[in-house]
């Protein structure tokens, strides 16, 4: 409730100068939790693989249910940016493994990641994407939380843990990710490329979501901590609680 109240206050229109002045203490307090960019390499870049060496075969990606279309990355924090504004988004969109360097990118048309994809398509350029895995659980929660448009998910994560998230620049693109996450899968989506059939997938509803066509994500780098732990979730029929798997690499 406190988070919701703060976000509503921060995003509320302030027509008068007096309204803006009254908002200063709130905004000053929130500034303590804004993400910070740091120079150099982060813990998530202690081991770096690029090019042909950046193989997803190094990850224990799971097939969760018998009729799933394949193996899926199920706890990806997908980092994208709007090409016009530079505003960041972090969302959670499952990723079906097609080969060692290619996955699907399952963002529905109403998700911010899909809107960023459409903007990159209009620009005629490839879309940089970086997928973070693991790290502070606040990151995973923030990636799934219902947030107002243009509100930074890493700000919410900073508020929840009472300290700002430190971000580092990726190795092969200009996306910034949490310095202390476990893995980062760097790559791109080419909006000019034909979409691929993704699914089925045993989903939260207790039913399989059907096959559909989604963009392809191509891997350019795989970085990780030396003591990385791979996170995954297996969703199922309510009221089952989603299972969380932590696999040490």
Predicted features along the sequence, with ranges:
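Calmodulin-binding IQ motif helices
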Residues: 249
């Amino acid at each position: 409730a406190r988070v919701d109240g703060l976000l509503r206050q921060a995003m509320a229109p302030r027509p008068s100068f007096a309204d803006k002045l009254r908002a200063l203490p709130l905004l000053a307090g929130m500034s303590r939790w804004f993400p910070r960019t740091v120079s150099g390499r982060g813990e998530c870049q202690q081991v770096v693989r690029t090019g042909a060496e950046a193989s997803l075969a190094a990850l224990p990606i799971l097939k969760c249910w018998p009729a799933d279309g394949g193996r899926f990355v199920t706890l990806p924090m997908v980092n994208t940016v709007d090409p016009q504004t530079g505003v960041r988004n972090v969302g959670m969109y499952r990723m079906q493994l097609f080969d060692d360097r290619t996955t699907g990118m399952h963002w529905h048309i109403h998700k911010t990641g899909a809107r960023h994809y459409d903007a990159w398509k209009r620009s005629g350029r490839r879309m940089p994407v970086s997928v973070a895995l693991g790290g502070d659980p606040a990151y995973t929660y923030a990636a799934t939380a219902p947030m107002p448009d243009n509100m930074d998910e890493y700000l919410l994560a900073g508020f929840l843990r009472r300290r700002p998230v430190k971000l580092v620049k990726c190795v092969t693109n200009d996306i910034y990710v949490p310095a202390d996450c476990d893995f980062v899968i760097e790559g791109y989506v080419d909006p000019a490329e034909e979409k691929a059939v993704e699914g089925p997938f045993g989903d939260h509803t207790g039913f399989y979501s059907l096959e559909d066509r989604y963009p392809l994500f191509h891997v350019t780098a795989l970085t990780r901590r030396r003591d990385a732990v791979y996170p995954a979730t297996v969703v199922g029929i309510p009221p089952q609680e989603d299972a969380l798997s932590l696999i040490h690499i």
